[in-house]
Amino acid sequence: MKDHRLWLKRRELLIYIAIFLYSVALFLKRVNLPINQNLLNKTMMLGTLIALANIIFDRKMNPKQWILTAVIGLLLLVDSLPTGNHELFYLFIIIWSCRNLEKRALMKYIFGIVLIMTLLTGYLTCLGIVKNDVFILNETRVRYGLGYNVWSILPFQFLALCFMYLYLTQKRVYIWKIGAMIVMAFAIGEVTDTSSSSMLTALGLLCLYATQFVHIKKWNKLKWLMWVPEILAGFSIMATFLYMRGNSFFVRLNAVLHYRFLYQALGFNDFGIGLFANPEYETSTDPETYFGIDNNYINLLIAWGIVALIVILFVYSYLIKYCIRMENIKLLIIIMIFVFTAIMWSRLLVLIEAEYLVCFSEAFKDKRLRDKKEYLFQ
């Protein structure tokens, strides 16, 4: 057992390097810096190749784990072939490579990378080195990017940092810290014109704060939550088609939600639904030609295809089941917030925001290193 752990320790450094390369490149792809996108893509690929070596040389999995690895890996690889965009495949490899590492330490590591990069981006934006784009929509809505190429990035990134801080901290969190985070969230929301993200941040922070005083005794009764991602995906599709048929409720709701249903309907009409990724799908942040599908479930279905949507729904059902099995209320709340808000924002697959994705690697963890309670495939 000690020899096995020593062998793993020698490989852990490579995994941390892989995560660093992947996370930094992914972060920089969203920042207004004159960096060659092809270089960033190759950096992500390099990180993935380092992580891939852990799969090639790893033999300590049971047949079910090998089958699951092969099925998900091949499905995501084949799914990406029509577009040549292998980001989902890269993400899976990075997550898989974390299977025998301590998950809280990994999340803390990614949190540290993102926090430093966020502070550095803010500082460089104040100095004028990073461009602060101004977006004007419908001639009335003025939004600032604050150093990022899309105005919605920083608000949700700040939300994710706050949530992960409350999850990772071992000390009691005082209400004044929650209040300070909420004030900062509304300040960012005011500048970026994303009030909904500010309210979501406030609600999530208060829920996480309340976990210090709330204890769940009957966790088994929460198992139904693992089907919530599938329910929300089905509801999103149904709601869009009802809007396309002229349902008065969803037509009015479309105006309230800043035409989200309109863009989803355009996506279905212009690109349709395929089994695999659609090479013709393209978004635009240009105010004159703006097009984007914010609903993560619809976005996955149209841009990445039916196969990718099914795989991601399975991943999130597993993550919810994992939280319930481990009786981890904080992580469960964070994941459920991401799952519910996926009907409005596409953030389910952004590792530098959804650090909890590394927990999916528990499905492939070496049985000798497992706690019996953790072993979901026994």
Residues covered by each model-derived region:
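Membrane-proximal cytoplasmic C-terminal regulatory module of class A 7TM GPCRs
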Residues: 372-378
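Interfacial loop-to-helix junctions that mark the boundaries of transmembrane helices
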Residues: 35-39
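Long extracytoplasmic/lumenal interhelical loops at the membrane interface
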Residues: 249-304
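Hydrophobic transmembrane helix bundles of membrane-integrated enzymes that assemble
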Residues: 2-29, 40-59, 64-248, 295-372
